């Protein structure tokens, strides 16, 4: 697939920035959840996607980080988010990633089942690139990874963990240990860090990694 070809030569793949932060900064939008805007204000979400693409992003994420607990509503938000992102990315030839945030701690489903149910909706909309991001742990990751590759062998999956400047998640788990476990899964295509720490701390954390232990 093209994304693997794009990355094969070591070329960086520049993603967009946060959707929620950008959306909250728009007039009158500070207290609203951005995901609901896929249904209520799709033109605003499309405009944010385009702004990131015009700034040079070569990959954008669907506005689906936290789609809530009501499944019927969540499904409609995912479907709308896919349509908006695909339409925005097409003129730029950019990649679109299905964006999944952490599973609810007290949700009705185990994390793996939660992720797989969402993934099925993304696949039905034609998306094959996935990012599971801002994770405090890796519960459910293996289930999602194996499910995706069984359902869609060409699927591309990134897993990204949120750590503090000391390299620990909010669940008290070592980010390095999480990266190593995720990288050991054959069905996971890439691992990394995002959120919580600023760019300087994230750079220091990455520079301190033993990349050979991550398959790098």
Task: Give the role of each language-model region.
Residues 1-216:
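Domain-level signal for soluble alpha/beta catalytic cores
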């Amino acid at each position: 697939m093209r994304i693997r070809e794009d990355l094969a030569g070591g070329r960086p793949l520049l993603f967009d920035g946060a959707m929620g932060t950008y959306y909250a900064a728009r007039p009158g939008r500070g207290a609203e959840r951005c995901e609901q805007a896929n249904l209520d204000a799709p033109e605003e979400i499309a405009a944010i996607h385009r702004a990131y693409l015009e700034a040079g992003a070569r990959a954008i994420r669907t506005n689906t980080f936290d789609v809530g607990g009501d499944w019927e509503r969540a499904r409609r938000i995912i479907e709308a988010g896919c349509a908006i992102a695909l339409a925005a990315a097409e003129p730029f030839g950019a990649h679109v990633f299905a964006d999944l945030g952490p599973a609810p701690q007290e949700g009705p489903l185990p994390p793996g089942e939660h992720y797989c149910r969402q993934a099925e909706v993304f696949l039905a909309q034609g998306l094959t690139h996935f990012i599971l991001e801002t994770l405090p742990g890796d519960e459910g990751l293996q289930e999602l990874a194996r499910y995706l590759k069984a359902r869609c062998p060409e699927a591309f999956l990134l897993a990204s963990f949120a750590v503090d400047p000391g390299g620990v998640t909010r669940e008290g788990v070592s980010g390095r240990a999480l990266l190593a476990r995720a990288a050991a899964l054959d069905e996971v295509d890439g691992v990394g860090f995002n959120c919580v720490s600023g760019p300087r701390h994230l750079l220091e954390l990455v520079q301190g990694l033993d990349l050979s232990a991550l398959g790098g």
